[in-house]
Amino acid sequence: MLVPLKLVRDQPLQRQMFEQFASLIHSGRLTAGARMPSTRMVAGQFGVSRITVLLVYDRLIAEGCLETIPAKGTFVSQAPVPRPGTAMGRPAQAPSDGSAPPCGGGIGETRLGRPDPTLFPLARWRALLRNSVVRLGTTAGTDHGTGAVRLRHSIAGWLATSRGLAVSPDQVILVSGRQQALHLVSHLLLPRGGRAVLEDPCDPSVARTYAEGGADLLYVRVDERGIRPEALPDGPAALLYVTPEHQRPSGALLSAERRAALLDWAGRSGAMVVEDDYDGEIRYGGIEAAPLMSLDGGERVLHIGCFATALGPWVTLGYIIVPISMAQAARNCKRLLDDSVEAVESAALAEFLESGAYARHVHRLHKIYSRRRDALLGALRRHFGPVTTWGTSAGLHLAWHFPKTLGAAVTLAEQARHCGLEAEATGGADAQALLLGFGTLSEAGLECGIDRLAAHTSVQTGSAMRAV
């Protein structure tokens, strides 16, 4: 199958491929259920790196345009395709009904942790983009190497203020989203394979990325205080991947004692710690643990961050903070993957950060999402009494460890989705948990959803008791 893309060499290839594939899906030229060509075939057809195609497919999968069926391949999603009009870095009109962003799926699709698209500061962002185009003039287009110098300074300043991280702009490597960050880390730390230690449970895209890098994967179980240091393996390891602020997916917050223990283990094993701060912008007060990178002194930790939780998928830029000793190697690796950053978007984001508008936007989000989280917790307590939850200190989803009398987690998650909630099942041999998202629903919508779920489970429980 030949793919009808028209690529030019003076624009970022990854961006072009994403936009053109999305357009083919929007227009119906790639029909629902159609099998996509392999990444190797596409890379060969256009003479590009297979990593570039993998990143494009990953982005299309993340946004619901494509879906992967194990042992069969990658296919155009069966979900309804929304109107065209959104490209990377250019927001479409945020829908007023709180529906999913472009390429979003249909009923029953969860995608936990989605931000509310109606909260995106659309007018402000469009003004920033227009101003950036005017200022850049004929230089607008792409920026090379580690990205726009101004944005790297802006991110370093923002991290110092918001996360207490003292880093040099030279340590900031700009990437086109979290997935490219994961691929860059894989190339940087796993050039010849090696042992990669991951959390259990773990985001499947992380495991897939490191497996593709040739890593020998080892999983370490997570409990309510995060990954368990005593279960970390003896002997050498290449990397340890953790999500300490809001474990993905369980929501667990890594305790201060365990943070110190992880760094001690990393020193003994020779591993680099990859700290994914994917939900770091949305925190709800209380005692805040210091980022691993600040505790480490900057030698054994790489810190991944992005703006997607606060700004949604329309602003794709992210970053990796690397130890200063690795900065040159990281820049070289970035050039091999994709030696460009969209100049207009990076200039707009730098202005957003420097003006204080981004900080005000994040503060507003904290208040709105905090009320939604409280509404969800209040509804759970009202119907189910004292509840055990993880992940209430950050992010846009929490884990409810529900009573076994409510049945299987998978069944309860399906019931919750039918009640209008954003839900997924998780858990293991020792626990049952339901992951509940609260980013895209109003307070009233969350309360109504839990009311309906409680009524449904009450009827089921009563029927089961009568049957006995």
Model segments located where?
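Helix-loop "lid/cap" segments that line or gate small-molecule binding pockets
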Residues: I155, Y319, A347-S355
